[in-house]
């Protein structure tokens, strides 16, 4: 959530930068500024009236002692009038704050200056590529057919489309990837968290999934709880309403979780097999840092995620997302994609983002600096990595007549070198 200070002091700049995200902010920004003025005017009047009430209250006792009952009664009447006025002013201020908050949560984060102009995925800028795209025979199979051939995935029998059931070596490959990613994160200095898979609305609001992505989240109505779309939500919310010490920063956490997304409106080739699921496994990395260090942290996270896709020997590329493809809460995002040699397309396996102070302002996640001043933290997170499309690319790219070759780094975790 943007701060009132930024909105009121940098109105034109805020409107200009939000236009990069194709968000027309003029009307809502001006409404917020007007409400903030109402709030401040009400507060000023309240403060003045309270000062006067205190002054008159002190006078009343003296007037009574001096026998000036009529003057004391006038002062009492004025105190009563001022208190009644203050009740109205307090109600006006409270309503202005409520209306202002309801508008603030509708405004996306400001994009970083380096975010390219663009309307969608086609305008994202490729920053770097690596790995070798394998040359496969014409009869090479897509991963959903390989899963059937090798009997490693049972499909939609239990829950329906988008909820895969892994079997045998398929299940062991999933577990191997999770353990490999968690071990790598631990070795890189991340502290492992085991989070819940359901959160309350306040947690979803804190990281920005609510209200923006409410329609994409599974909601347990009876308990008013949400299935998590990513471990980012519970892990980042650990630091809600917390004031950290500067010496505690940066905080590095990692977590494995199942993730749940409704993916309403998805259809066609993008949803075949493991391309787009309602439930999937992912390892997440989360960092909390000082504002002046957060972009260094972002670079380190990008480097770390690159090391994972390189270790899996997959062809990869890094995209800097354009304004039109940037998420509601992100200031800058780098997407990692791996190439599917059979589908002939790039598959997203990670997004690494800096949210600057946007989430922290919602969460009230702060730190006390060297001067003992309380400041908003910057929050960052990234997928490290999301499993389904990694599995899809591994199955397709590593298929041979003898079976599917397992990357060397995974063999100690799987206990086998090929699926055959």
Task: Please identify what each model-predicted range represents.
Residues 26, 130-420:
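TRNA-recognition modules of translation machinery and tRNA-sensing kinases, especially anticodon-binding
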Residues 1-133, 145:
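N-terminal alpha-helical targeting/anchoring segments
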